Amino acid sequence: MLCVTIRIKRNDELNGKRLHKLLIDFLIQNKVAGSTVWTGVDGFGKRKRSTIQLEGITINMPLIIEIIDEKSKLESLLPSLKRLVNDNGLVTIHEVDVV
């Protein structure tokens, strides 16, 4: 099994739609076994700090999208996932043992 992890920001958009929603829709359409979107508390990277505080409200938090499925399935989807994420985030892969 393979795990693809995508790190983006909550406010990232593509064609006027939130990127994390586009990614989840894409994964459902391609019948991926499972995916979870995690909200981060704080973070930073090449696009600077991920979290912004406005009058006590946290916005634009980092998001982590974990995707798990068979290696052959996810490897075939990687080019499309990279194209969707583009320069908005980071895509990593690693093998996992599901117990």
Residue ranges and their predicted role:
Residues 1-99:
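Positively charged, small/polar-rich N-terminal and surface patches that mediate targeting and assembly
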